[in-house]
């Protein structure tokens, strides 16, 4: 009985992969050019592809066996009070952190931002983490992950180096077109060098000052020009590669972590988003937040909850995409409350630590947010369907007259951006889908797998991240799919795709001997390398052809001698444009 059952799983999973690849080929003619497409109307081909994608998800979900050897959920730890009244180092650190936070908040509310306010803000999270020292070695309360191996870390180091090389290559030439929003960030950040302002909301784009200060720090370290602005962003984007590996390893195993990191490394979308400053920090912060939170749940150790709280508190201080954490955390908490209530009641002190860490990291921004809530919310009300202008624009754009019809179009364009619809943002505007064909096909299967295992908190976390990002960054916003808004979903996407890839690998490798598995691994590496090379060539070629006149003029002027006089004589160009100023 066992052997036929395995073959049924294998046939079903491979059939699902074939359906996903066929659907992708119908939509974009990759990886296979189908002559059939030329005989079909575009709408017919799209509907057929949508049906095939849905069938692939369903078939893979049915073919996927229950996860083998799934670790049991951790038993709630015995209560170990941290807030004891005794004079201990943890109690003293917590008291100092709380007093420092209150003092900093009071100083800010009474006199505004100052060096003392910033020092107290920084001291709070550091003192809080210090309360967990010295770390006592306690065994994890669940089955631990496999022990580390040298090749695992060697592969991760190799991928991280490759990711940096791809993202730093031709750093000031790619992207070819520099959108005005990016140069505004550079101009505003340049003004903050020597005059730091970490608290509040910048009036130009209504982004947090903290976000601009990160760019100012980058330019102070690496140069007060486009190179200095971009390099800091590239370093943050590169750091997301090992962060995704860690999260994938925590949620599943090293194979999922490595494959997810590889898929993100070769992604042209992540390559671009890592360069253009605005979305890079949210990707790293949310990935680390989820990794710390899950490690805390898995091990029952409070320090990971504290770190998750600190990252959660930092999430509203960068670009808006990071605020998806404010959806992920409550929904996961609610899931635990319904299905694993003991993980709430038995670890309530750890959950309080998460809240306290978030409060400390958010710091004096709490005072600003309470005083100027509308400014803190930024452009939320201007770019969503709640804005009547946006609503009317979308009705006219789609030629519909009702909200349900509008939402159907919004959902289609958002959900299918991984397979078909191109970016609408001025910062990228890449003329193709968000994912390459390999990642897109694996994502389809990974979603089916995760939905079939939705009772598993790991799947629930990824599906929540995925769905919340698409709803908040696409369905409810103006002119989706805007990849600057939707980019926050990429870590969840590659982990979902990697889970499907590893499941397929397990089915194919099961009957093979050691040499057969090595050959299969070599084929996987070759496939990833081939897709990665094609992704880079496609991205670099597009970048050369995407340059707009304003950027071409600014690049030309920047290469002239410093004493050269330049006169602009034709609209719509003006020296007041940030592209020329920066």
Language-model region placement:
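Membrane-embedded, hydrophobic transmembrane alpha-helices
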Residues: 1-153, 307, 328-335, 351
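Membrane-interface transmembrane helices that cradle and orient dolichyl/undecaprenyl
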Residues: 106, 287-305, 312-315
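Transmembrane-lumen/periplasm boundary regions of multi-pass, lipid-linked membrane glycan transferases
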Residues: 166, 174, 183-199, 207, ...
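Transmembrane-helix motifs of polytopic, lipid-linked glycan transferases
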Residues: 231-251, 288, 444-448, 499
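Transmembrane-helix signature of polytopic, membrane-embedded enzymes
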Residues: 244-266, 456-464, 517-524
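Short acidic/glycine- and proline-prone juxtamembrane loop motifs at membrane-interface regions
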Residues: 269-281
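Catalytic lumenal/periplasmic loop and adjoining terminal transmembrane helix
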Residues: 272, 321-325, 503, 507, ...
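Hydrophobic/aromatic-rich transmembrane helices and adjacent perimembrane loops
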Residues: 273-274, 324, 437-442, 459-509
């Amino acid at each position: 009985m066992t052997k036929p059952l395995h073959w049924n799983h294998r046939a079903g999973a491979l059939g699902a992969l074939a359906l996903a690849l066929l659907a992708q080929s119908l939509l974009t003619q990759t990886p296979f050019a189908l002559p059939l497409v030329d005989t079909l109307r575009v709408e017919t081909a799209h509907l057929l592809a949508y049906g095939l994608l849905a069938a692939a998800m369903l078939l893979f979900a049915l073919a996927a066996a229950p996860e083998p050897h799934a670790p049991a959920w951790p038993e709630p730890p015995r209560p170990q009070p941290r807030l004891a009244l005794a004079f201990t180092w943890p109690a003293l650190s917590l008291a100092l952190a709380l007093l420092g936070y209150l003092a900093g908040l009071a100083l800010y509310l009474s006199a505004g931002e100052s060096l003392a306010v910033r020092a107290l803000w920084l001291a709070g999270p550091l003192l809080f983490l210090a309360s967990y020292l010295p770390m006592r070695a306690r065994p994890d309360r669940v089955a631990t992950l496999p022990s580390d191996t040298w090749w695992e870390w060697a592969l991760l180091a190799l991928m991280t180096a490759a990711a940096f090389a791809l993202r730093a290559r031709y750093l000031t030439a790619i992207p070819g077109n520099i959108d005005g929003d990016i140069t505004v960030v550079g101009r505003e950040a340049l003004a903050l060098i020597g005059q730091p302002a970490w608290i509040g909301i910048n009036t130009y784009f209504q982004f947090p000052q903290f976000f601009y200060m990160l760019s100012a720090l980058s330019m102070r370290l690496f140069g007060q020009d486009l190179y200095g602005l971009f390099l800091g962003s590239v370093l943050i984007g590169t750091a997301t590669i090992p962060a995704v590996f860690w999260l994938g390893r925590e949620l599943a195993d090293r194979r999922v972590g490595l494959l997810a990191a590889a898929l993100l490394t070769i992604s042209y979308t992540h390559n671009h988003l890592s360069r253009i400053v605005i979305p890079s920090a949210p990707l790293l912060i949310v990935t680390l937040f989820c990794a710390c939170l899950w490690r805390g749940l898995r091990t029952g150790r409070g320090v990971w909850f504290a770190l998750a709280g600190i990252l959660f508190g930092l999430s509203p201080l960068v670009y808006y995409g990071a605020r998806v954490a404010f959806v992920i955390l409550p929904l996961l908490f609610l899931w635990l409350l319904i299905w694993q209530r003991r993980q709430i009641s038995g670890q309530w002190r750890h959950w309080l630590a998460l809240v306290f860490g978030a409060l400390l990291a958010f710091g004096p921004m709490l005072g600003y947010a309470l005083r100027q809530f509308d400014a803190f919310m930024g452009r939320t009300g201007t770019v969503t369907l709640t804005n009547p202008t946006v609503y009317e624009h979308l009705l006219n754009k789609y030629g519909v007259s009702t909200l349900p019809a509008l939402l159907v179009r919004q959902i289609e364009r958002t959900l299918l951006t991984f397979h078909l619809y191109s970016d609408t943002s001025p910062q990228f505007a890449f003329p193709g889908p968000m994912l390459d064909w390999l990642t897109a096909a694996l994502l389809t299967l990974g979603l089916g797998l995760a939905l079939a295992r939705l009772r598993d908190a790991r799947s629930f976390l990824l599906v929540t991240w995925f769905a919340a990002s698409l709803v908040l960054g696409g369905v409810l916003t103006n002119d989706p799919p805007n990849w600057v808004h939707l980019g926050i979903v990429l870590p969840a996407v590659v982990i979902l795709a990697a889970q499907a890839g590893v499941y397929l690998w397990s089915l194919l490798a099961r009957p093979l001997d050691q040499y057969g598995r090595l050959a299969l691994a070599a084929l996987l590496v070759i496939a990833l390398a081939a897709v990665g090379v094609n992704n880079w060539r496609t991205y670099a070629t597009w970048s050369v052809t995407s340059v707009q006149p304003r950027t071409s003029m600014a690049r030309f002027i920047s290469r002239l001698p410093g004493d050269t006089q330049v006169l602009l004589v034709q609209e719509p160009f003006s020296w007041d444009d940030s592209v020329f100023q920066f």
